[in-house]
């Protein structure tokens, strides 16, 4: 669709993005924080194959029933998380998630090689170098991709408090 109407803006009714990304416009910390920890399709696939969520930087839910998920130490080393992801990359073969990741790596970061343990550090570093630039901040990406509207898949009970100031400023004119 994008090839047939490249100049038209994107109206996304189902964006897997955190609205706070746009409110804060802070740089994404690293490749793992962009591609793994916020993406339930990625971390659920890994979890379904025996990778503990804590090993992916996902803390136990505060509202989880006692004993429903015995949590170990939550991994905070983004590079280790990325290496786990790379080691399990073949799990994504033939999935929509793999199509999306390949597209993001190719089009967003110019990465043409397949992710694997042997090149995990090089790809992690390449993505991180790009994320450190102003061109890869959330609002810059929003503009670059010609997104006019994005509705997020945030929790329906999210108060969106982080957007109050921006909304009030727009109303004042």
Language-model-detected regions and their locations in the chain:
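Metal-cofactor-binding active-site regions of metalloenzymes
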Residues: 1-9, 15-173
């Amino acid at each position: 669709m994008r090839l047939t109407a490249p100049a038209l803006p994107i109206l996304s009714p189902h964006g897997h993005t955190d609205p706070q990304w746009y409110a804060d416009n802070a740089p994404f910390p690293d490749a793992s924080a962009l591609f793994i920890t916020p993406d339930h399709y990625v971390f659920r696939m890994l979890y379904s194959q025996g990778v503990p969520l804590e090993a992916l930087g996902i803390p136990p839910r505060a509202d989880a029933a006692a004993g429903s998920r015995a949590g170990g130490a939550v991994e905070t080393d983004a590079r280790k998380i990325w290496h786990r992801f790379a080691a399990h990359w073949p799990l994504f073969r033939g999935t929509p998630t793999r199509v999306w990741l390949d597209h993001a790596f190719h089009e967003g970061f110019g990465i043409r090689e397949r992710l694997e343990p042997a090149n995990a550090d090089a790809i992690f570093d390449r993505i991180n170098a790009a994320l450190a630039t102003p061109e890869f901040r959330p609002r810059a990406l929003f503009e670059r991709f010609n997104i006019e509207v994005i509705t997020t898949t945030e929790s329906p009970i999210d108060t969106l408090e982080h957007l109050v100031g921006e909304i009030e400023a727009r109303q004042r004119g």
